[in-house]
Amino acid sequence: MVWPYLVSSVIFGSLFGLMAIGLTLTYITTKVPNFAYGSFVTIGLYTSYSMNRFADFTPYISAPIAFGIGGLSSVAMYLGILRLLARRGSSLVSLMIATLAIDIAFIGIFGIYADYLRYGRNLTDSLSFYSFLDDFSMFGAQGLTYVAPISLALITLGLFMLLTRTKFGVAMRASVENPTLARVLGIDVEKVYVFAWFLAGGFAAMSGSFYTLYSGGGVATGSGLIVEIFAASILGGLSSIYGAAIGGIIIGAGENLLTGGGIVLLGSWVLDYQKGIPLLIMIVTLLVLPRGLASLLK
């Protein structure tokens, strides 16, 4: 009875860790809460869905393609909208509202694409589809139970090596901590920001691609996960990549385990309050650690 909840908690926590890292990358570069971030998760969902239906690819094969599409979409959003608004003097509140508008536009685009697949390509489940069943299994657990945490660990390690062992990583850190001084030193801050936004969109889309093996999806799936993603990033300190990874694990696993335990002990009505669990975890943690988990990592 406990095993399925443990497995799903590992998957859920690892995927939210990936998503939270990406959201943190967008925040530390522009200081704007990106409420459109969940839509990049949906891009990964529909990339895997399309490639599965048309080419019979598993999400493991389509994940790198989803990474590229999500990364390019994220860069387009930054260069085509947010940077232009910022250069015209828009406030942080205006930029935040712009991300909300972009998210609504994305949902509309996904709806148009889903309708095309439904009526033009006869894919009747395009608006809302079940999880894919073509995952491999190992030691009695589905493959994503191993792939998701390994991917999170490798990406976190890769970012650590990039930021601490390479010249470009040092330039990234300088651009984030003091962009004005970085420009004086000759660092191309905009190039750094574009790279960070590419990674952020890529991580979101890749996690969305993996998500199709865990749960079903639809046009607003990514947007519906934004509460958990923000909770994980804030729990991690909002400006710490490593804190975001840990925060994602805590939020994802905590939501799964507490929801599952609540259903067993109290009944199915607990599901109605599932979205409140990540916020509760975040609030309790911040009462103890006001600066989030990042304060423990310094």
What are these regions (language model features)?
Residues 29-33, 72-120, 162-165, 223-224, ...:
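Short loop segments and helix-boundary regions at transmembrane helix junctions
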Residues 2-53, 80-90, 94, 234-241:
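Single transmembrane alpha-helix segments in multi-pass membrane proteins
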Residues 84, 93-165, 192, 264-275, ...:
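Transmembrane helix-bundle core of multi-pass membrane transporters
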Residues 1-12, 159-167, 196-233, 256-273:
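Inter-helical junctions in multi-pass inner-membrane proteins, predominant
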Residues 113, 177-184, 188-191, 262-298:
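Cytosolic-side transmembrane-helix boundaries in multi-pass membrane proteins
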Residues 25-45, 89-93, 168-171, 189, ...:
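Short, non-helical or kinked segments that cap or interrupt transmembrane helices
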Residues 1-20, 47, 58-62, 88-93, ...:
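Membrane-interfacial amphipathic/re-entrant helices at transmembrane-helix boundaries
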Residues 138-218, 222, 241-247:
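Helix-loop-helix "hairpin" substructures at the membrane interface of multi-pass membrane proteins
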